[in-house]
């Protein structure tokens, strides 16, 4: 191009978007340049040796040949397996399986981004939603299978655990556990790759548990990445042998003709071996709740109380525990933007204070809305697992009202996704222990102060009432009792946990409260639901200490102490009898509920702690009197 003075204009290309050729000879080399190598542990073989031991066949006494990394990523490169232990002379006569001749690739503690990629390549049912969450399916099972859960009954557990009527613990023997374990391992070892997570339970560093999860699905690995406490690189280097291991072979069925099996689904726990085996169900919640059951066994042995509760802390350091079954408002009332969230579901109470067991939240999603649950709504983003939700195939927007797959739709996300989460998830000793009940009979007070015996009684009872439809279309309340507000997960007799709760409350000066979030002025269909703003005022009065200085009067039958006045709450609703126009119907309904409490408690009445029955007698004295 000519310049104004007749010369030639030259161009300076340094400011343009041109560049030197890339330093790669093949497309594979270019791909390798795209991904910067991550830092590795000081001893790269160390976790593989430990994982190989975890995957070892009990019959052959040695683990598979393991290679770290995705088989696709290492294609063309010669595998460098770890050397497994050779079998003993006694095991040498047992024929080696074909799986010992192949390499199993271990994908170890992958990041969420890596697990997304694995999930997309592994299953047609994994998609990214419009907000960045991973939507996936859990297969035929969309909830837990409590009837298929088994616990090994041996000389120790036969004496320690709660067995029989009312207990969630269904027995199996050690031999059948080992058979199921071998079945799960044979399946996992036959795969080209398995996902392994090494993580922690319990934010109290003095009492945390090392857990290893071995699974065939990337979504399960991401789920547990979110739900357990995530180790740092330094902690992984010294992780060593886990305290407990889950073998999740849920894509492979159990043998329904084997002993103790009732279906092709089987969830087995051996407390002696510190292992859990999952067959025939891909529902991720089995892993979370299985570990919770294990914590219910291990922690009380250390003098630590494990609790199925929510927990938050005020600005002054006052901690509150919230217990309640589904529909009582536990999540709503424990989520308070004026207080820090320690956890939403599983906690420990030790001499150090309270601590969250988990590193994440597993929230229900059915009918989720931004207006009602903004924290959960905003937490559903990249890294979150959305289980069994329905979404628009083009926009990928989730329809949280759609129950086509199940009503039990769930979101699993790290607790850090909640803006007011307290990290680390620990706090001082609780000042208040709040037991929530949605009483659809309408006879329990909106709030009652409990003494220690009453706290133990209502904690063991774990009461709420649901509204169930009858054949003629009339809806009647149905009482529901779940010991310790989580009977499905406890290992010991409920009285043991109740005694530990009372001991810690007395030692650290906590007060017990029973809060009814249900009906007033009549049962469901006659009275009205207690307004949420009133319940929030009650909870605020508990947190502030206002109710400690209130005047109280005692109710009949249940013998509950109810305050005569609370700021912001109409005094007439504090006494249930005041709100019923039909006083005879009130008395009849009150006695009916009291009878249901007594009938439910019969299974607990004969349990002894120590050499006498004094504690149980003390608890029974707090029962309804009529």
Curated annotation (Swiss-Prot):
Coiled-coil residue spans: none
The name this protein goes by in its record: Phosphoenolpyruvate carboxykinase (ATP) 2
Pfam families, per database record: PEPCK_ATP
Subcellular location: Cytoplasm
Biological pathway: Carbohydrate biosynthesis; gluconeogenesis
Database matches in HAMAP family: PEPCK_ATP
Extent of the signal sequence: none
PANTHER family reported in the protein's UniProt record: PHOSPHOENOLPYRUVATE CARBOXYKINASE (ATP) (PTHR30031:SF0), PHOSPHOENOLPYRUVATE CARBOXYKINASE ATP (PTHR30031)
Main localization of the protein described in the UniProt heading: cytoplasm
CDD domains tied to this protein: PEPCK_ATP (cd00484)
EC number of the protein: 4.1.1.49
EC category name: lyase
A molecular-function term among this protein's GO annotations: phosphoenolpyruvate carboxykinase (ATP) activity
Spans annotated as Disordered: 1-23, 64-86
GO cellular component, as recorded: cytosol
Sites where the protein binds ATP: 324-331
Catalytic reactions of this protein: oxaloacetate + ATP = phosphoenolpyruvate + ADP + CO2
């Amino acid at each position: 191009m000519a310049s104004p003075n007749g010369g030639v204009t030259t161009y300076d290309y340094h400011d343009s978007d041109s560049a030197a050729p890339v330093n790669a000879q093949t497309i594979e080399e270019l791909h390798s340049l795209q991904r910067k190598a991550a830092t590795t542990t000081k001893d790269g073989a160390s976790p593989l040796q430990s994982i190989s031991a975890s995957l070892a066949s009990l019959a052959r006494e040695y683990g598979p040949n393991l290679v770290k990394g995705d088989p696709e990523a290492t294609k063309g490169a010669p595998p460098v397996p770890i050397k497994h232990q050779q079998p003993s002379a006694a095991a040498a006569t047992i024929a080696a399986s074909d799986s010992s001749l192949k390499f199993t690739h271990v994908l170890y503690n992958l990041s969420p981004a890596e697990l997304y990629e694995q999930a997309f390549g592994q299953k047609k049912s994994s998609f990214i939603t419009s907000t960045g969450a991973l939507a996936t399916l859990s297969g035929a099972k969309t909830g837990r299978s409590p009837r298929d859960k088994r616990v090994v009954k041996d000389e120790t557990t036969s004496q320690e655990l709660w067995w029989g009527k009312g207990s969630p613990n269904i027995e199996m023997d050690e031999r059948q556990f080992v058979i199921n374990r071998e079945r799960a391992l044979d399946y996992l070892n036959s795969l080209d790759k398995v996902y392994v997570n090494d993580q922690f339970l319990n934010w109290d560093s003095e009492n945390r548990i090392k857990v290893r999860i071995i699974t065939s699905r990337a979504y399960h690995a991401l789920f547990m990445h979110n739900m357990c406490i995530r180790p740092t690189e330094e902690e992984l280097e010294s992780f060593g042998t886990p305290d407990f291991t889950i073998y999740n072979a849920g894509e492979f069925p159990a043998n329904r003709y084997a002993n103790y099996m009732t279906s092709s689904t089987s969830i087995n726990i051996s407390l002696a071996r510190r292992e859990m085996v999952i067959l025939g169900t891909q529902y991720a919640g089995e892993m979370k709740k299985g570990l919770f059951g294990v914590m219910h066994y291990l922690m009380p042995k250390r003098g630590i109380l494990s609790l199925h509760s929510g927990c938050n802390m005020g600005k002054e350091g006052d901690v509150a525990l919230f217990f309640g079954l589904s529909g009582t408002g536990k999540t709503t009332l424990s989520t308070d933007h004026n207080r820090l969230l320690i956890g939403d579901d599983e906690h420990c109470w030790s001499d150090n204070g309270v601590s969250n067991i988990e590193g994440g939240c597993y929230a229900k999603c059915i009918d989720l809305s931004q207006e009602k649950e903004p924290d959960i709504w905003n937490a559903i983003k990249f890294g979150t697992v959305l289980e069994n939700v329905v979404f628009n195939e083009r926009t990928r927007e989730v329809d949280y009202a759609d129950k086509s797959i199940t009503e039990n739709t769930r979101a699993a996300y790290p607790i850090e996704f909640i803006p007011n989460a307290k990290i680390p998830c620990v706090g001082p000793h609780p000042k208040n222990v709040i037991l929530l009940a949605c009483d659809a009979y309408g006879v329990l007070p909106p709030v009652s102060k409990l003494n220690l015996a009453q706290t133990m009684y209502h904690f063991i009872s774990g009461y709420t009432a649901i509204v169930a439809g009858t054949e003629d279309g009339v809806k009647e309340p149905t009482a529901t009792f779940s010991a310790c507000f989580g009977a499905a997960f406890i290992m010991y007799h409920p009285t043991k946990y109740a005694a530990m709760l009372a001991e810690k409350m007395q030692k650290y000066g906590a007060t017990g409260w029973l809060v009814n979030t249900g009906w007033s002025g009549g049962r469901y269909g006659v009275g009205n639901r207690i307004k949420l703003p009133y319940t929030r005022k009650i909870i605020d009065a508990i947190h502030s200490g206002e109710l400690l200085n209130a005047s109280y009067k005692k109710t009949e039958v249940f013998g509950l102490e109810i305050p005569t006045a609370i700021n912001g709450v109409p005094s007439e609703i504090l006494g249930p009898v005041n709100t019923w126009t039909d006083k005879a119907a009130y008395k009849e309904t009150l006695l009916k509920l009291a009878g249901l409490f007594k009938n439910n408690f019969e299974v607990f009445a004969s349990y002894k702690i120590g050499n006498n029955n004094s504690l149980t007698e003390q608890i029974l004295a707090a029962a309804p009197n009529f």
